[in-house]
């Protein structure tokens, strides 16, 4: 037997075997916090497009948990029953979803958290939300010259929100003459929630100089409430950089800044990371952080917006 000739043949066979064994992304399950929010719609659409680039025949199922824990548990169970290869999850409760995530992983499914971290996932892709909160609230501090009455309008207690509030508080803490009137009211992550909570603030507090809303929909709702009650002189900032906030920064509103995210790029990165893990390529870091940028009335003209068709 000619071993010199045999070894290259065996090596080639092994290489071809590895290529054949590469796993194709055939089915993707996406569970978002709320598809009533354009941000999450863009996340789902970005993930779908990237999955179809990897495999035009991929089956994508995108669902809204509506911030309902039991609903998201059922969605993960359905994904497992459907034998998806990859789940992208925007966890309603990062800790409580751990058992469902473990069940999916035990079934051989790769689970990647998007926008918020979640216990037990293979990897996470999200904005640096602490930095986003800092940027938005440092803007408030600067505009108010370090003094005044400020409100932090909170939201659903997922890590993206708690991290933004953490970053905001860090910026405000450096300005001792800033008084935080409230930081515990939940605007539900929605325009309606922001409007309702802001109406309460405006009734309770005769003087509000600034407000940080944890996302753009809440900021827009808050601005509307101030308009309805004819209250001016309030600087409103938020996080997202959504199309609606672009319009708000160009028109007659009290919204002055938003720390922008890129849900389209986030989703596409998450699919890439998940597909790599599916094929035994671990990411360099367990958590991929995307850097936010502050958009204001001064620089909105150069802002390219979310990198999608939205």
Give each language-model segment a name.
Residues 1-8:
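Bacterial N-terminal signal peptides that target proteins for export
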Residues 8-18:
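Bacterial N-terminal signal peptides
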Residues 22-310:
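A residue-level marker of the well-folded mature domains of exported/periplasmic proteins
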